[in-house]
């Protein structure tokens, strides 16, 4: 028990019988080692579930399909095909376009809401936040399905408007289109925008706003010169948190996209399903990952710049 | 908070906007239960009349019960394991100085952002190369990866708001590590644990994309629904089933959020 206070804190982790061993002694002394030991089961699962699959996926992307098996001679053919055949580039471009529009729409629509809760709600803030984020935690599939019910050829909007006599024939652009995918994505990912926006707005020192008012800024100038720049990190985080996951979305374009709204995720799924070209699917996944990594770096850079401007 | 002066002035347009926002957020989902009570095989206006027959039909379907049982089994196991892993991860992250900690946290949080389809196909490839057949266990592994970030994110604030001197006091008073954990640490993080269990269960219960790639012959509930979407005549019973799932999910998540936050605000205040 002599070394109990070695780390400056009373030891509450290591159980007494193991203290005699040399390994235990080392663990007892080194905070880092103990921390890593404690977190190791979690890391082990993450390794089995994320790192190993990614390595195999990377290996597979250099193989070629051969009948029902694989030709395991490494080759760049899949990557060359993705680079040269226009369909892949077009699909990637469309995916980024659709999720880009959805991202901008979501952030623009959610900003006033986050602003309202951060500055104008004084009681039950927690309830408001729970209310705004609650749908997000429930079944993604069913929320997308709900939009199919609404936008369908005989869906809520079309049949409702026709029953009211507002339109004569169903509006066909609603279902199986990029518009449908964008609307649905914007709705489904709202919570991912609300939370970072709210956090960054809530952090703003209210006295800065009063200072701006005292110095003669009107509400608009005050917003543009104080609130908006200070909330920029939240805006960037919101864009990142929506744009990245939606580029690879599968369910929404599958249920609502139709041929015009198909995205890269659907194409990847096809390679593992009907087309049965797993190496190609692996290559597409890796290419998508590389794009995501590149975009993440851009966002990181933007965040750094926004932070630097504030402080 | 009390120093806001002009900010206290209510802003009418913003209030109206907030109300509309909430309505738009919730109404689409509400159409599912609305049409599940509609006495027509077609999902369209005008409504034909109220009925419970779609729910009754659901009750007699063997595959629905099987899928429910599969989902519950996977959900419970995933919730327990991911919460345990979340507790030890949150504990390690907050309690010890570890180099590379922020990289570690980023790594754990990765599944939050990276499209699920990539994890799904990557796991599928790994399992098939290793010759492991697709079963509920593989679905569970996929769900574990998806749920872990949420467990850690729920539990981290608990451990961050936790004063280490409490544990030191307990140790000084003669408790050993084990009892200190059970009598001091655990009660203080308990609400976070409950919230994490509820949340991860719901996420696993509702999860689709991982199950889509990793399900063998036993479908989970979302997979069962996906299979039924091809048949227009099944639409009303899918709506009834979806309503029930949404109802349960909303209650569980609301409880999780409520339990997860209430105590947190109290610890911050004190």
Q: What are these regions, as identified by a protein language model?
A:
Chain A
Residues 3-11, 18-21, 26, 198-209, ...:
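C-terminal transmembrane helix and the adjacent membrane-cytosol boundary/short C-terminal tail
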């Amino acid at each position: 028990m002599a070394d109990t206070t070695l780390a400056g804190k009373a030891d509450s982790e290591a159980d007494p019988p193991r203290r005699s061993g040399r390994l235990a002694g080392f663990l007892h002394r080194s905070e880092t080692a103990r921390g890593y030991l404690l977190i190791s089961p979690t890391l082990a699962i993450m390794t089995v579930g994320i790192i190993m699959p990614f390595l195999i996926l990377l290996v597979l992307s250099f193989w070629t399909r051969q009948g029902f098996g694989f030709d395991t001679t490494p080759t760049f053919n899949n990557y060359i095909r993705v680079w040269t055949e226009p369909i892949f580039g077009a699909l990637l471009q469309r995916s980024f376009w659709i999720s880009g529009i959805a991202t901008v729409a979501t952030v623009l629509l959610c900003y006033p809401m986050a602003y309202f809760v951060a500055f104008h709600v004084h009681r039950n803030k927690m309830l408001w936040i729970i209310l705004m984020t609650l749908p997000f935690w429930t079944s993604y599939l069913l929320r997308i399905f709900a939009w199919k019910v609404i936008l369908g050829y005989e869906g809520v909007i079309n049949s409702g408007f026709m029953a009211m006599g507002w339109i004569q024939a169903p509006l066909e652009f609603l279902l199986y289109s990029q518009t449908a995918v964008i609307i649905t994505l914007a709705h489904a990912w709202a919570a991912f925008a609300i939370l970072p926006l709210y956090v960054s707005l809530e952090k703003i020192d209210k006295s800065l706003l009063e200072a701006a008012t005292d110095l003669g800024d009107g509400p608009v100038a005050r917003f543009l010169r104080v609130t908006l720049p200070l909330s920029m990190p939240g805006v960037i985080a919101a864009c990142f948190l929506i744009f990245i996951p939606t580029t690879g979305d599968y369910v929404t374009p599958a249920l609502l996209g139709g041929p015009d709204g198909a995205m890269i995720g659907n194409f990847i799924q096809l390679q593992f399903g009907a087309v049965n070209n797993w190496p190609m699917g692996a290559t597409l996944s890796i290419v998508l990952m590389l794009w995501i990594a590149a975009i993440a770096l851009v966002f990181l850079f933007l965040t750094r710049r926004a932070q630097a401007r504030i402080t | 908070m009390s120093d806001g002066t002009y900010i206290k002035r209510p802003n009418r347009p913003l209030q109206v906007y907030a109300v509309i926002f909430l309505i738009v957020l919730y109404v689409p989902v509400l159409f599912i239960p609305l049409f599940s009570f509609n006495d027509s095989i077609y999902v369209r206006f005008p409504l034909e009349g109220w009925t419970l027959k779609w729910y009754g039909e659901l009750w007699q379907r063997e595959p629905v019960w099987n899928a429910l049982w599969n989902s519950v089994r996977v959900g419970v196991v995933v919730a327990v394991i991911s919460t345990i892993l979340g507790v030890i991860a949150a504990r390690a992250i907050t309690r010890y100085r570890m180099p590379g900690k922020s990289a570690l946290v980023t790594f754990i949080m990765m599944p939050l952002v990276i499209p699920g389809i990539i994890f799904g196909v990557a796991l599928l490839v790994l399992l098939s190369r290793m010759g492991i057949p697709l079963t509920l266990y593989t679905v569970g592994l996929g769900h574990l990866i998806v749920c872990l970030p949420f467990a850690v994110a729920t539990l981290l604030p608990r451990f961050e708001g936790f004063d280490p001197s409490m544990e030191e006091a307990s140790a000084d008073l003669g408790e050993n590590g084990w009892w200190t954990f059970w009598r001091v640490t655990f009660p203080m993080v308990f609400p976070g644990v409950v919230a994490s269990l509820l949340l991860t269960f719901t996420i696993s219960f509702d999860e689709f994309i991982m199950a889509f790639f990793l399900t063998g012959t036993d479908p989970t509930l979302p997979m069962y629904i996906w299979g039924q979407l091809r048949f227009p005549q099944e639409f009303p019973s899918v709506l009834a089933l979806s309503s029930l799932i949404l109802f349960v999910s909303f209650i569980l998540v609301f409880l999780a959020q409520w339990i997860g936050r209430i105590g947190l605000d109290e610890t911050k205040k004190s």
